Design a protein with these regions (language model features):
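Nucleotidyltransferase catalytic core that binds NTPs
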Residues: 1-137
Length: 137
């Protein structure tokens, strides 16, 4: 079964910390790929400074396999909700194992996210601490 990591964020801008997390999770958990998913409009903070096109270009220029750019939230438009993205990706990749990658700070706020209880039903969550320790829960 193909294992896909899902790593969302504003990526405004993408930086070495983002790339390091994605690569280390891919290596440590033997993922086939990690999809970097830039949000269109975060539900919990202000609009990114860089435009969607600029952020897509920055990400595209910064990554290589096994990292993959996925513009689903930007293409969908409006406010980005993780649960909507997970529902779409579960339908798009029904035979794959999806693992959502979160920083520990985001994990602790997860209960406040839109339809948080559904997120736990749709995916396993990989929590990465600030020092890049990888933990699958």
């Amino acid at each position: 079964m193909k294992r896909i990591g899902l790593f969302g964020g504003t990526f405004d801008p993408i930086h070495n910390g983002h790339i390091r997390i994605a690569v280390e999770v891919a290596e440590n958990l033997q993922l086939d790929e990690v999809r970097l998913i830039p949000v269109n409009q975060p539900s919990h903070r202000s609009r990114p400074i860089a435009s969607a096109a600029q952020r897509l270009e920055m990400i595209s220029s910064a990554i290589k396999v096994p990292l993959v750019l996925d513009d689903i939230e930007i293409q969908r438009g409006g406010t980005s909700f993780t649960v909507d993205t997970l529902n779409y990706l579960k339908a798009e990749y029904p035979s794959c194992s999806l693992l959502m990658i979160l920083g520990d700070d985001a994990f602790w706020s997860l209960k406040t996210w839109h339809k948080a209880e559904d997120i736990f039903k749709l995916t396993n969550i990989v929590v990465v601490s600030r020092d890049c320790d990888v933990k699958e829960r």
